Design a protein with these regions (language model features):
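Conserved acidic catalytic loop of the alpha/beta-hydrolase fold
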Residues: 1-14
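Conserved hydrolase catalytic core segment
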Residues: 12-51
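A catalytic-pocket lid/entrance helix-loop region that shapes and gates access to the active site
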Residues: 53-72
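Active-site nucleophile elbow and catalytic-triad environment of alpha/beta-hydrolase enzymes
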Residues: 87-103, 109
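Short beta-strand/loop motif that positions the catalytic acidic residue
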Residues: 107, 113-115
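Conserved alpha/beta-hydrolase "acid-adjacent" motif
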Residues: 120-125
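Catalytic active-site module of serine/aspartate enzymes centered on a nucleophile-bearing elbow/loop
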Residues: 136, 140-169
């Protein structure tokens, strides 16, 4: 989808910034379309479902089972639609992304991985991602959790802009 939007807008190459699942999409795009990506900023992303903390992954799987079960019983229309959408989202989180060592090592663009030690993505997983991507930098934002980007966008923006300037982008 990212490359299709770029084609529609006549954008040959781009710096792609993604948050959470958007970070996963950005990394997948860089892996599959290396010629289209100048750089990636991946905020609170994961390469594999097991990159989530055990508690977060368990919560996702339990909620998935709950919503899946609710789809099988008679429900009012609005509740049924919510059950379907919730199950789809949680199923995505439980099974995707699938960016293994091979896919990450194919990324040619420089990558900035921003995360926090209190993120639902395990810090060790973020470091592992950085080890697999040839030109990457992992930055732990002090005191950050999964949603800190949405609360302290200026602090994240400063990290991002400094890194982009350093890379000449």
């Amino acid at each position: 989808d990212v490359v299709q939007v770029m084609e529609f807008l006549h954008v040959p190459r781009a710096v792609i910034l993604g948050f959470s699942d958007g970070a996963n999409v950005a990394l997948e795009t860089a892996s599959c379309y290396p010629g289209r990506v100048s750089a990636v900023v991946a905020v609170s992303g994961n390469a594999l479902p097991r990159g989530m903390s055990a508690a977060s992954l368990m919560e996702v799987k339990l909620k998935y089972a709950l919503w899946r079960g609710l789809e099988k019983v008679p429900l009012p229309r609005g509740v049924r639609e919510r059950a379907v959408k919730s199950r789809q989202l949680l199923g995505l989180m439980a099974r995707w992304p699938r960016l293994d060592k091979e896919k990450l090592s194919c990324i040619q663009a420089p990558v900035l991985i921003l995360t926090g030690r209190r993120d639902m993505i395990r810090p060790r997983h973020s470091l592992w991602m950085g080890e697999q991507i040839p030109d990457s930098k992992v930055v732990f934002v002090k005191g950050a959790d999964h949603f800190t980007l949405l609360k302290k966008e200026k602090a994240y923006g400063a990290h991002i802009m400094a890194w982009l300037r350093q890379r000449g982008l």
